[in-house]
Amino acid sequence: VLKELADQPAHDLVNKKIVPDQIVPTGGYDIENLSDPSRRSAYHGSIETDRYGRSIPKQAHGTQNLDDYTSSSHRIMNAAVDLFDRLIDPTLLIRRLYIVANHIIPEDTALQKKDRFTQLDLFTDYAAEEQKQKANAADLERERKLQEAMLSIRKKFGKNAVLKAMNLEEGATAKDRNNQIGGHKA
């Protein structure tokens, strides 16, 4: 589900021609974690009160900086999953997940900012680094073209016209979320 949640904003970023360099995944825990005696005894973290006055485990929240400004769904998904695995308590039930993209700028501005300075040293093979950067740039360009093709198909035939295999796995919610309007059944 988290990969689906990270993939959708990446497509929105490509559509709007904007790029972030930071993502913030947040996971809120379910109230059942503290009402179930076995889970309650296993949990030793902080407890907060929700807006209804109920006690719930404190939500997991973290920030992951990306290497560069990007709208690559692959890089955003990997960063979100890595941070999620470090933050979320696997013994607790999760009620809600959301991902926020920070430090958003237009793509053309990001291309101008790409010329960053690097500290040189004697032990790095800069020819190999340059080859790696060229291969990475080619991969990002190929992914970008694929994302744009998927967006054009989705605009013409609907959001469920093109789905990834992860959207068809058991427990996946993207297909259902694509049929909703404002989070409600259409």
Predicted features by range, described:
Residues 1-186:
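Basic, low-complexity intrinsically disordered segments
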